[in-house]
Amino acid sequence: MKRKFVYLYLLGLLLFSVACTGNFRDYNTDLSGITDDDLIIDDNGYGIRLGIIQQGIYFNYDYGKGKNWPFQLIQNLNADMFSGYMHDGKPLNGGSHNSDYNMQDGWNSAMWTHMYSYIFPQIYQSENATRNTHPALFGITKILKVEAMHRVTDYYGPIIYKNFANAEKHYRPDKQEDVYYEFFNELDSAVVALTGYIEEKPESNGFARFDILLDGKYPSWVKFANSLRLRLAMRIASVAPDKARAEIQKIKENDYGFFEAETGGAVVSTKSGYTNPLGELNRVWNETYMSANMESILVGYNDPRLGIYFELCTDETLKGQYRGIRQGTCFAHSHYSGLSKLFVKQSTDAPLMTASEVWFLRAEAALRGWTDEDEETCYQNGVTTSFHQWGIYGVEDYLQSERKASDFIDTYDEENNIEARCKVSPKWNPLDDKETKLEKIITQKWIAMFPEGCEAWAEQRRTGYPRLFPVRFNHSRNGSIDTEIMVRRLNFPGTLQTEDPEQYSALVEALGGNDHGGTRLWWDTGNNNLE
């Protein structure tokens, strides 16, 4: 009881301190009064920091201003929508907003402000606290750092990373290329720290009571590092293939492997008191609905995951159907309120990486000739693992299916109707060209990663797959976002232009293009460069 009281007391103080360090320039202004000795009690300080970081990736902890709404701005009204997964069902902002590329700065800046205000300071402090004394926790911190911050650079491009706490270098931002190369260095450090500790203390599981992503076992964290390295290596496959292959070679030389089984993966557990913010938006706020893309592909494929991912329409005229909303429809009515909502509840674990995703990454690596694995086997294992993850068996018929996506028919306005864009079926054909094979791999990976929109949006931008419907209306400023090419990134927070113009100029310079949603990121080449 005493330990629990101390833990909760320190957690409250630490959350307060995080809320007081809003600007990354003032990251070290800790007003909590917590001493290093306080944080050492039962290792609570280390666990509390890592707990905050774990809750801050799929963001949902209360730093004093409530829960759930930060996630809506950080992810749901951006990546979850741009990925082709979801759409809001209410006329937010009068019906015109990010959906039709009338980009809202308050929404677009949320990832930046929350990560730099509340998560990166804890990462920095955890690194310093564990570097020389707690190698396993240091390794875990590094993995969480990469998992958290790759989502930030995948939104914006250049970020403040290596110089986050470096006043002498004026917190100079890094180009995305440099950030990614540093990610790989961070994962190197993590693997060395963890594997060394495991060899020294193979039975140790001291982090288990703080672990809300994995099973508390350190070998699982090495698997996470390897799987994350593979994800990031494939992200740069088109722009830096030699570096990508070199990183994959490192994984081959590691004995711990990847996430493979349907029970493997990194998910934020709700058994710890964490609640899924998407579930709150979905079940309580009634603001998340199936997208037209999900309807087109899942209904067209007769995919058995359809009834697990989404609920049937509540509109009596659409009884027994799964129907979605097309992005960019600009509606100021409630006619879509009876369409299909998500299955996600507040108690649903929040996925960050699944074993099925890793199988599809392995399929692409094999397709590119970078491993000696069989691309078809990896592809089929990816589909099978996804099915089993949701308790679905009998995948054989699906893997032989030649069904295609269906046309989208709007339930209210026929002007929103559009022919199916996705032209591939689930069945693998060894005679297909490499581009068609890649489209099948990424389309199935997109289905399997649901509802994790950050990764889905990043991969859709990188590869162009699945082929999504263009927005019905495009209200981007000065036509900065092309309707067919679609939104490529989020702009930097608008407040930087007035509050820190020097920093803003440095970020735009590192971007190498205009600060709007039409500018491609470093890894977004527009060509998959399949040899």
Model region roles, listed by residue range:
Residues 20-79, 125, 466, 478-531:
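Membrane-proximal, proline-rich intrinsically disordered regions
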Residues 60-105:
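TM-lumen/periplasm interface segments of multi-pass membrane proteins
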Residues 387, 391-531:
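C-terminal functional modules
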Residues 62-73, 158-159, 245, 453-458:
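Beta-strand acidic-aromatic groove motif in beta-rich domains, primarily in extracellular
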Residues 88-396, 431-436:
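Structured, solvent-exposed acidic/aromatic patches
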Residues 1-29:
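Bacterial Sec-dependent N-terminal signal peptides
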